[in-house]
Amino acid sequence: MVPSYPEKVYAGFLGMNIGIRLGAPVEPAFWSYERIREVYGDIRGYIKDYSHFAADDDVNGPVFFLRALDDTGAAPTPGSVAQAWLNYAREGVGFYWWGGFGVSTEHTAYLNLKNGIPAPQSGSIRQNGQALAEQIGGQIFIDTWGLLCPGDPARAARYAVAAARVSHDGEGLHGAAFMAACIAKAFVTSAVREITAAGLAQIPQGSLYAAVFREVGAYHDAHPEDWRGCRQMLEKSWGYDRYPGACHIIPNAGVCALALAYGAGDFARTIEIATMCSWDTDCNAGNVGTILGVACGLAGIPAGYRDPLEDELVLSG
């Protein structure tokens, strides 16, 4: 057992929820990178005071999909996680972004399951097309699989991919494997390069996902103080205009790579940079928040971020 395992799980879960809460106000598409910079400048704390934070799909997924373990007592499979989808998600109400068939990856997969299309076919490129299968949901619902596998990135990646295959395929699965592996590795090291190396070891090196991490890493090595320059590079070479769908995983993977590199192991700075980069702000800050929460532990999470949560979490199923 990893020393202080319960505390690190708690810190990781706090980190995820803090990142989501920080990024949520600027998630809507009209909050461009330029607008966030103009309105908020250098973010150094919450930009909105929530008395209560509503249920969020980025939290629902990691919590409810774990029911597959409770219900079966076995390692997750696409089939067992698909059954958890059907058992615990109420169609059209809360839980996911119910954006419509062929628009929302999760809505499409859910309707596939209801119509008798089993997992993993329900989330496959063959069934839904590449654009839908490679949206960001592949990596944003998998945090708890990493929390379950301390110090074992390979097992975390396997669990995450099994769960993600209900709704995603291709690069979406690489994102699932990467994020879960990073979280698992963060239990045994706080060195960001070691953490990301563990994640990259679980995905094909010829993938776009690995390529964007390498390019961000190379830019950081050449310009270690210029995260905004790195963001401009992402816009030019890996931006939303290059990928189909509402919220593709690759540009947002680039933001996570940037935030992890330039955050340099500091919890607060990592989630702040992820938020200032725009695109899917709550998802990206949530993912890196889990990784850094585990790596830094409770002592590394500033009270100004932790205290407003008051250990309160709202879910919707």
Model-inferred region functions:
Residues 1-317:
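Structured, active/binding-site neighborhoods that engage oxygen-rich ligands
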